[in-house]
Structures are given as C-alpha cells and as structure tokens.
UniProtKB/Swiss-Prot annotation:
GO terms for biological process: cell division; chromosome segregation; defense response to virus; DNA repair; exonucleolytic trimming to generate mature 3'-end of 5.8S rRNA from tricistronic rRNA transcript (SSU-rRNA, 5.8S rRNA, LSU-rRNA); histone mRNA catabolic process; mitotic cell cycle; nuclear polyadenylation-dependent antisense transcript catabolic process. It is found in: Nucleus; Chromosome; Cytoplasm; Cytoplasm, Cell cortex. Residues 8-28 have a biased composition (Basic and acidic residues). This is Exosome complex component 10 homolog. Mg(2+) 1 binds at residues 296, 354. Component of the RNA exosome complex. Interacts with spn-A/Rad51; the interaction is required for the recruitment of spn-A to the DNA-damage response foci. Interacts with Su(var)3-9, a heterochromatin factor; the interaction promotes association of Rrp6 with a subset of genomic loci. Interacts with Su(var)205, a heterochromatin factor. Interacts with HDAC1, a heterochromatin factor. CDD domains: Rrp6p_like_exo (cd06147). It comes from Drosophila melanogaster (Fruit fly). Its EC number is 3.1.13.-.
C-alpha cells in the first residue's frame, strides 16, 4: 500500500489551520492592494487543491484507510465552512444534506450574489453611484389653468409697482390655451419607500393609524381613539388635534388691517435646504421666531400606491426653507411645535390634500391656518389658482410648465428648486392683500371670519386609505359611452380586483399597473390568446407582462360565462362623452344665460331700402312709398302690456251669460231635476247593454212567443192533445227533446225549455215615460222659490187575453196532471231537457207576519245528491255481473247473437 506524501499532508493541515483562523484585516484601504492580496490567496488555494491525487491515483490513495479518514474529515470541514457562507448570504437550504450536483448549484448561486454585491460596492467605492442622475426631459401639451391675457402697456407712473388686476385691463378676450408642460424625471430612480424605517401598509383591512408620538401645544392629552363600524371593526381614528381645533379662535390682530410688504427677489433671499437632523433643529428654532409662515407640499403618486410627500417648502418674510422629507420622514414631527401653535399663522393655498399628506407621511398637524383658495372664492375672483393670485396682486407671470416633474430625484435640479420656492416666497404678501380686501367688503362684514372657519374645517380632515367596493368598476363604465354585457362586466370586475391587489402588494399606482383605458379595452374585446391581451396595451405595462397568465385566466373565465344581460341596467347606463370645449365652466365670469349685452333685433322685418334692378344699388324710396309700408306685425292673441282690442257683440253676450251662470245659485232640487233625464237615459242604455249581453250568452234557442202560438190552428191542436192523452202513461213519461214536439205550447209544457215562466198573477210593469228636456229646462228657468216637481208618468198596458182554444187546452192539461201529481211530487226527474215543475197561481209570500226569532240557527245551503260507491269484496258472486256490465258499456255497438 503506498504511503501518503508528507508534503501534501502538511499543506492540508496548514490550509485547515488557516481556514479556522479569523481573517486578518487589511492595513491598506486601497482597492488595488486588496485585490492583489485576494488573488494571491486564491492562487495558493488553487495550487493546493490541484496537488491532490486525481483519477486512478486518487482511487488508489483512497484505498488506504488513513488517507480516506483524513480526506473525509477535511471534506466535512470545507462543506461546513461553505454552508456558513451560504447562510450568511441568505441562501436557503442545507448544503450538507444535498447531493454533489445540488451542492454545486448552491455554490454557483452564492457566487452570483457575491459578485453582484462586489460590483455594487466597487461602484460605490469608485464614485459611480455618486454621479448626478441623468435627467430626462419631455414636453407635453396640456390645458392652461389660467387665461392667456396679454399684459397691458403700463404707464411710466405705474411701472415698477404692483397693480391690481381687473376684468377690463386688456382688450383681448380671455381664453384658455394649450401650454407646453415639461416632464422632469431621471433614469433608474431608487424607490424611496424601500429605504423607510417603517414599511408602508397598503392593505385595505387595516385602517390608517396616526403615528404621532407626542402632542405639543395640546389642550387635551394625546389619545388615539378608534371609531367602529356596525360589525365592531375599527374603521378609523379620531383627529389628534380635534379638541384644539374646536376650541380655536383666531387672535384679534388677524382681524385688523394688514400692512403688506413686498418680498425681496428670490435671488436676494436666503435659501436653506434641510436634509439633516441638525439643520432641521436649526430651522425649527428660526421658525419659532416668525409670526407668519407660508407652507406648500410637493407630492408624488405615480410609482407608489398611496403617495409620497417628497418636499415641504416653508417661507418667512426673510428666508426660504426646503425640507427633504424623503430623508427626514421620521424626524419631521418635531415641527408640530410650530405648526400647532395657535398664535402663529400658517398660510397655504388649496390645503385640502396638503393636510392629509402631512398627516399620513410626516405626522404633522396644523392649527390656525389661512387658506388663500377659500379667500379667493369668498372674494368672487375670476380664477382661484395661485398663478392667478400672483398675477392679480403682483403682476407676476409664474411658469407652471414643471407641474409634471418627478420630485423623487436626488439631488434636485436647480430648475425644480426655483419652481418650489416661488409657491411660498410671495404667499405672505398675497395673504396681507387678501385680508385687506376681505375687511373692505362692507356688504358682508363677517367674510374674513368665515374664511378662517372654513380653513379650520380643512384642518380637521383625516386621511383614509383608498378602498374599492363590489361596484367600483361600474364607475368606469358610466364615464364611457360603451355598453358592456355580463361577460365583459365579469372580466372588468376581475381585472379591476387584480389591479387593486397588485397595486397594493407592489406599492404601485393604478396608472402604473394598468391604466383605465387599457383595462376597458381588454374587458371589451375579451381576447382568446395571451398575445391579444398584449395587443390591447400600448405601451405594455411591466406588471402586465409579468402576470400575463393571471390576466389570461380571468379573461377565459369571463368567456365561459353565459350571455344573460346584453346591456347594462338602466340605473348604470353609460352617458355619452362630452365633446372637448375651450370654455372654462368653473369661471365666475362664464354666464351662458346672461343676454343683457345682446340686442333683440329681428332679421325678418320689412326694410325701406330697395335694390335698383338696372344699377343693382340700394336706393331710399320716396316718402309716399314709405307711408304705404306697414311695418306692424299681426296682432297677438294675448298681450300683457298692450291694450286689448274691443270685443265683439257675440263675445260680450257669451261673457254676460257666463257671468250670470256663475252668479246664479240653484237649489239642490232643481239640480236634481236637471240631471234626472240624463240619469234615466243612462240607466236605459245600461239595461239595453245587459239584455244584449244575456242574449249573446244564451246557449239554447229561445222559446216561441205567444203571438206565434196563437197563429196555430185550433182543431189541429186539439187533435194532437187527444192523441197524446190516449198514449199509455209509461210512454208519456219518456224523456223527449224539446224540439221533438214543436206544436206544443211552451207555456203549458213544463219540460219544453229550461227558461222559467212568469207568474200568472204578476202583471207587466208599464214603461217609464221620460219627460222631454225642454220641459225640464222650462221648469228650471223659474225662480228658486217656485219649485216645480215633474212627475214620472207610467203607461198601463193590459195583458193579452188568451184565446178560447188556449183555455180548453189548459183545462185538459191540468186535469191530466192531477192524476199523478201526488205520486211524482217528491221525485222529479233531473234531465238536461226538462224543467223543474213550477206551481201556478201562488203569489209572492208575505214576510211581514213571519217571526224570524225562531230561525236562530240560520239557513244551511242545500247539498247536492251524494253518490257513494259500493265496495264489494273480491269473492263476491256479483263480480261476474259487474264485469258483464262494464263490457256492455265498452262494446255497446256490438250485437250479441246467441245470448238471451
């Protein structure tokens, strides 16, 4: 067995000893010296590793137990050291439990991380990351916020002094124009929110919690009191300075006339950029000496979900301050010592959003504020922007082309610094001028106090996180002129929820994740393939390309939905898009219904000028011709200011009759008599309609009338009656159809028809005689004292006398029926062609003498004949008969031969 070389064994021991010892710190900080030393160590380690036996020699050496044991110990130590390095570099996994291939992949991953970190550190050490960021500038055309008014030429006496603006200073018409806005940004800007000490919480479940730790200038101790919803969940928190704002009253000196002092030029004013804690404390001490402070905020909202406050500008009468809030985010709260002091006035312009941004990011609150935007609205100014106020009071044109700048750039370009300074540098002077204007409004003496009250209400605002509801996506549909079906709405809702979740998790805005117009395009087209989704986006957002599969699954689920609703409901119907307009509808001077400056001139009136047919020139006619021209128009049917024409004789008579009718009071009885003929006529018409309806509903034909029966021959009737009576009784009782015996009398034959017969003792009522209307009107024309009652006359008609032949027939019929009337009195046959016999000669029953007390139980309704089925057993002897009976009905037409 070959022995292990002593040199190799000693080198392995030295290498292991050096690995166990901690690395010595380099005395030189030079990058080149450190690199040379590292190369030497790497070369020595490579030589030592290459000195080990390889191939067949290594297999031969491993067969020796001592060599194999030493190599196993060294291998475990090296793997343990590599595992410690991987763990320190946040490489997940245990390298000791992996296979050799997996161990090699883990080492490669660690090398990549180390090389990237080394490259970054070398760039920082070499100063490559300290260079100024490359500024990208783009030009965009946007609508100007103010009117394009050319300044008038000032006189020598007024040059150099601020002039008050007026609506008639220039002859040009104020029109909004397109201005060029410059977009300032930089490439590869580091996201500031990644360097915050406290991570940003974008979740919708957790409400915004104020981060205020101490409460200076307080009347009530600091207490963050939550507000709960109906379900018992925390919805929001109360304002920390709500009690102080409720008790706040502006000092008396703020209601006195101010003495505005023109500020110095920005080039002559000191500027302090506060980006360290030491400078912040120094600025705080200087601000505590100033009675009035102008404040403005610069905000960024494109590459973050809730937004980031990037700059805060403050100005006093002698100095300007710019606070870098990205660096001093967690230390700016010490400025509450000044901002919450009720004795110091804070001046802002349009502070609705500034108040919320200061609360959310910097934990800053304001007490005693004057909002110049509210003051401009109280003064009914034509514009409410800060640029207009500077133009109005200072005749200063402010460049607003940098409103699209990216305020996250560090360091800030000088153009952005000057742009931020001008928002607060002149604001104190504007406050003084506006205060004097408000005090001069004698028509409304409390106007200044109302401005302070409105500004205090703005200070009470609290920040709330943005959230979406189940129908938030429908707001986008209502703003467009498109109509969506249920599939498209399903896709729109899914994409809308995906965008909200992605924006919160990635801390990006909705516009960066997926703009609204792209989202509507995807939901409307519902592309089948992934490339169709990308085709709807131009340019393609990075997060859309990254999560394309998720969006594709949402679209496919929407395509699988059944098409139920073709269009949107009426309450959520879309509105047509308004065409672009150059008019400023928010302007105080825009009065579309003010026509006082217009002259009412009609172009259809006759003219006195005539055109000569030969020369073609207009000529003035002579006076005689002018007199013939009648320029008056047709008289109106009704006029308010002109005297009406004299009415005609017919109109006077009609008006006199109407006045007499309105003045005459008629008695109620006369009114009754006047309406009586009309009511009788209406009742007769109703009876006629009912009679015609009954005739239409009659199923059986009507019986012949009495006159038709009288025309029959008497001898024929008598002979037929004798023949009928000679028939045996059994044949007479057989049922016959009423039309079988046409010659019989319907009055004497009870089974001939179902129509009931009239009572013989009852007489036909005479018809009502309607009095003519002329007679009633003559009676109404008399005086009210002489009431004349018009009686209703009835004409009595005699009943028709029966003929002798009819009397003989009745007598024979009555004599024939007396023989079996008593027998069949209680058992009348029920037939569809026979009537129930009725008794003659009985009059109406007299109920006057009836004692109804004996009928206490009341009457019961008669029940019909109940037919109960007999239930027979299976072994009954009559089952055979029942079967034959059923067979008889089933085969009733089959002749039975041979059976009796």
């Amino acid at each position: 067995m070959p022995r292990t070389p002593k040199r190799v064994h000693q080198e392995a021991k030295e290498e292991s000893a050096q690995a166990d010892q901690p690395p010595k710190k380099s005395a030189s900080e030079d990058v080149e010296a450190f690199t040379n030393k590292g190369f030497k160590n790497a070369i020595a380690a490579t030589k030592a590793a290459n000195a080990f036996p390889q191939g067949t020699a290594r297999a031969l050496y491993l067969s020796y137990p001592g060599y194999a044991r030493v190599m196993e110990d060294l291998t475990q130590r090296v793997v343990a050291l590599i595992g410690n390095v991987l763990h320190s570099k946040d490489i997940k996994g245990d390298i000791k439990k992996r296979q050799p291939e997996e161990q090699f992949e883990m080492v490669q991953e660690c090398n990549d991380v180390l090389f990237e970190r080394i490259t970054t550190n070398l760039d920082i050490k070499g100063g490559l990351r300290r260079n100024t960021q490359q500024v990208v500038e783009a030009q965009v055309d946007v609508m100007s916020s103010s009117t394009s008014i050319e300044p008038a030429v000032a006189s020598p006496q007024t040059q150099g002094t601020p002039k008050a603006g007026s609506w008639n200073r220039t002859t040009g018409t104020p029109q909004r124009s397109m201005v060029s806005a410059r977009l300032f940004t930089a490439k590869n800007i580091v996201r500031p929110q990644t360097q915050f000490r406290e991570p940003v919480d974008n979740s919708a479940q957790n409400p915004f919690v104020p981060r205020l730790k101490e409460k200076p200038n307080s009347l009530k101790p600091l207490a963050l009191l939550p507000e709960y919803d109906d379900a018992g969940n925390v919805q929001s928190y109360l304002h920390p300075y709500e009690f102080e704002l409720l008790k706040f009253q502006p000092p008396e000196e703020q209601f006195q006339k101010q003495k505005p002092v023109l500020p110095a030029l920005m080039a002559e004013t000191e500027l302090m950029v506060v980006d360290t804690v030491e400078k912040l404390k120094q600025a705080l001490e200087e601000l505590r000496q100033a009675p009035q402070i102008a404040i403005d905020v610069e905000h960024h909202s494109y590459r973050t979900f809730m937004g980031i406050t990037c700059l805060v500008q403050m100005s006093t009468r002698s100095k300007d301050y710019i606070f870098d809030t990205l660096i001093l985010r967690d230390d700016m709260h010490i400025l509450n010592l000044v901002l919450t002091d009720p004795k110091k006035l804070k001046i802002l312009h349009g502070a609705d959003l500034d108040i919320e941004w200061l609360q959310r990011d910097l934990s800053l609150y304001i007490v005693n504020m004057f909002d110049t935007h509210r003051a401009a609205k109280a003064l009914n100014m034509a514009r409410l922007s800060l640029a207009y106020l500077l133009k109005h009071y200072l005749d200063l044109d402010v460049d607003k082309s940098l409103q699209l700048a990216d305020w996250r750039m560090r360091p800030l370009p000088q153009q952005l610094v000057d742009y931020a300074r001008q928002d607060t540098h002149f604001l104190i002077y504007v406050y003084g001028r506006m205060t004097n204007d408000l005090l001069q409004q004698h028509a409304e003496p409390g106007l200044l106090g109302s401005v302070y009250q409105q500004s205090t209400d703005v200070c009470k605002k609290r920040y709330n996180k943005p959230h979406i509801g189940p129908e938030s996506h429908l707001d986008l549909v209502r703003k467009t002129k498109r109509s969506f079906d249920n599939r498209q709405l399903y896709a729109l809702r899914g994409i809308f929820e995906w965008r909200d979740a992605t924006a919160r998790s990635e801390d990006e805005s909705y516009g960066y994740v997926l703009p609204n117009h792209m989202m509507l395009q995807i939901a409307e087209s519902l592309p089948r393939e992934m490339q169709g989704i990308l085709a709807c986006c131009n340019p393609i957002p990075p997060l859309v390309r990254q999560q394309l599969h998720t969006l594709h699954q949402i679209v496919l689920k929407a395509r699988d939905q059944p098409l139920v609703k073709p269009i949107l409901e009426a309450h959520s119907s879309t509105q047509a898009a308004l065409p672009p307009s150059t008019k400023d509808f928010s302007s105080k001077l825009y009065c579309p219904h003010d026509f006082s400056q217009l002259e009412e001139i009609r172009d259809d009136l006759p003219t006195l000028l005539k055109r000569n047919s030969t020369t073609g020139k207009l000529e003035v006619p002579n006076k005689e011709e002018v007199a013939k021209v009648d320029p008056t128009l047709a008289a109106p049917a009704m006029a308010l200011f002109e005297k009406q024409s004299k009415p005609t004789q017919e109109e006077e008579q009609r008006w006199a009759h109407l006045r007499k009718e309105s003045q005459t009071m008629r008695m109620p009885y006369k009114r009754y008599l006047a309406i009586l003929p009309l009511m009788v006529q209406l009742k007769a018409d109703q009876l006629a309609r009912e009679r015609s309806e009954l005739q239409k509903r009659q199923l059986c034909p009507a019986a012949p009338t009495v006159e038709q029966n009288i025309k029959l021959e008497a001898h024929a009737i008598g002979k037929e009656d004798d023949d009928m009576y000679s028939v045996p009784l059994k044949e007479q009782l057989k049922r016959k159809h009423p039309q079988a015996n046409v010659k019989t009398d319907p009055e004497q034959q009870p089974t001939a028809s179902k129509r009931p017969r009239k009572d013989e003792n009852s007489q036909t009522k005479p018809p009502v005689k309607i009095e003519p209307v002329e007679k009633v009107q003559q009676a109404l024309g008399e005086s009210d004292d002489e009431v004349v009652e018009v009686p209703i006359e009835r004409q009595a008609t005699e009943p028709p006398k029966p003929s002798p032949a009819q009397n003989n027939r009745k007598q024979k019929k009555n004599q024939f029926q007396r023989g079996f009337k008593a027998k069949n009195r209680g058992n009348h046959p029920q037939s569809s062609s026979q009537q129930v016999p009725q008794h003659k000669g009985t009059g109406n029953f007299d109920y006057k003498n009836v004692d109804f007390r004996q009928f206490k139980g009341g009457a019961q309704r008669a029940r019909g004949t109940e037919i109960k089925q007999q239930i027979r057993g299976k072994n009954r002897p009559n089952n055979r008969n029942n079967k034959q009976f059923n067979k008889l009905f089933t085969f009733s037409n089959v002749r039975k031969e041979g059976k009796k």
